[in-house]
Regions:
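Conserved NTP-donor binding/palm subdomain of two-metal-ion nucleotidyltransferases/polymerases, i.e.
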Residues: 3-57, 61-205
Length: 205
């Protein structure tokens, strides 16, 4: 693999970093590989056209194969304690429009979510009209609830807006009531809470 060769210092001196002109080009590239299952987990509203591609953009993917997507996009690690070296960070840069754009390459079995839930997320994914994959509506809602109350210390106004769009009442958009709703859904489907790698928050109360 190209990135492994680069790490080991074995790549050709003439090797050129893969670059993409747009986020749409990235999605098109990913869709060329039938062995890769991938979704954008959240914050995909407005993609790929109505977002600013710069160093502040952070795209959260879930994939079935970390090393495959890293190779396809020629991603290079944005941190030192990287998964590639047996540690835990999966944050990578991908070059888009000559800018380094951050991607989280979350993968099945990494404890970001329960593995059974991760597999369901990929196996029930939906192709968005703009050419990228997203969770089905039910899974999007509940994984966003999980992210908002378990991974994060407080609920983002962005997520409050999305919860309302899904029909949730103001009165239950709080950690206690959302946790109760999530517990019921987890119990119904046989999912469990998972402690993720240390860079991710874990606020299970």
């Amino acid at each position: 693999m190209l990135f492994r060769s680069k790490v080991l210092g074995l790549f050709d001196d003439n090797y050129t970093q893969k670059k993409f002109n747009s986020l749409q080009d990235v999605f098109h590239e990913l869709n060329k590989y039938p062995k890769l299952k991938w979704i954008i987990m959240r914050n995909f509203e407005g993609m790929p056209h109505n977002i600013t591609v710069d160093e502040h953009l952070d795209i959260d993917l879930l994939v079935n194969d970390y090393f495959l997507i890293k190779t396809i996009l020629d991603g290079f690690s944005a941190t030192n304690n990287r998964y590639d070296d047996g540690k835990n960070r999966i944050l990578n840069y991908v070059i888009i429009n000559n800018k380094k754009v951050l991607f989280d390459f979350r993968f099945v079995g990494d404890n970001y979510y329960d593995q059974k839930l991760q597999e369901k997320m990929l196996n029930s994914r939906v192709l968005h009209k703009n050419g990228f994959y997203i969770p089905n509506p039910e899974i999007h809602l509940y994984t966003l609830i999980y992210h908002a109350i378990i991974h994060k210390p407080k609920i983002s106004p962005t997520y409050v807006k999305i919860f309302k769009e899904y029909g949730l009442e103001d009165s239950i958009i709080n950690k206690k009531d959302l946790k109760s709703k999530l517990n019921d859904w987890f119990q119904k489907n046989g999912y469990s809470y998972c402690r993720p790698e240390p860079s991710v928050g874990y606020h299970l109360h």
